[in-house]
């Protein structure tokens, strides 16, 4: 697959959609019905947007969804009761909890209640631990989206990566995926010394600092590949963490924001659902 310097997501997105459509049809032909549950608590506008976007995407792909919406003042006990019901339901293969949740609830507690094999957000500590241990796991969609780009760029094994993020949802799982693929990642953060020099010496820079304009021309070279994971709102406009206009004519490749990594994530959740179905099928065989 060839890309111009600005590597938009459309070629990758078309490929992912094609794979998903074929795989979901295959499951249906075998008599299986991919189904997921999405739990939303409260009235957060951003949560509402993503909630509806997932329902729309599921409908397009032919995935059954059970959408549960609870009031802003829902008690932890009531939320847990609904969550446990989803967990016990054998017809639901994947569960997601929209964030943020209201103040009386703890998102991490809720997510870690979900068995790893139904946690299609890849947000539980167990899934992260399984990934780090080389065991079957469901991985968060953002690191998976980065790996889709890595694969398409045909980056040689052994290449060096500067991963500017150390969170358990992006930097840490991504670094493990890179290691598993025989790349050489360095996880960077706000206290990393000589970060600009480290970025310049790396083959690939994955920037997810959460700061608009963080990555500038002083941190890249003509051979740099920049994968921008940042999503920031600046004066009503969505921008990444890289100073896009400043470096797009310098670097080898750069992913845009919007239209880059973020465009892939909603589809990769459904890839996780299919993977979850496989894990649950294996568990059923082992139990029986």
Task: Name each model-derived stretch.
Residues 6, 96-157, 198:
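Anion-binding alpha/beta catalytic cores of soluble intermediary-metabolism enzymes, centered on
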Residues 33-42:
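Short beta-strand segments enriched in small/hydrophobic residues
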